[in-house]
A protein has these predicted regions:
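Ser/Thr/Gly-rich flexible loops in soluble cytosolic domains mediating phosphotransfer, phosphorylation
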Residues: 2-3, 39-68
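A short, well-structured beta->alpha microelement
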Residues: 6-29, 51-54
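Conserved nucleotide-sensing/catalytic segment adjacent to the nucleotide-binding pocket
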Residues: 31-33
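Structural motif
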Residues: 4-10, 35-39
Length: 68
């Protein structure tokens, strides 16, 4: 399953960044979706939410686990 991220520029290898809400909506029910920094949008769509600080923590953790 693809991982699609909205609201962040930096993502791990293999994750897809989308720049618009319209593009994000096309991935609903087809990918695991993460919205960074817009809790309202994440709640509206029923997808995962990370604050910008949490996303930074995730990136550091991911890089450590996968030796990036």
């Amino acid at each position: 399953m693809d991982v699609v991220v909205y609201g962040a520029e930096k993502v791990p290898p293999g994750f897809r960044v989308v720049k618009s809400v319209e593009e994000l909506r096309r991935h609903l029910r087809r990918a695991f979706i993460v919205v960074v920094g817009d809790r309202g949008l994440a709640e509206e769509l029923g997808v995962a939410y990370f604050s910008e600080e949490e996303w930074g923590d995730f990136l550091r953790w991911y890089a450590g686990v996968y030796n990036l």
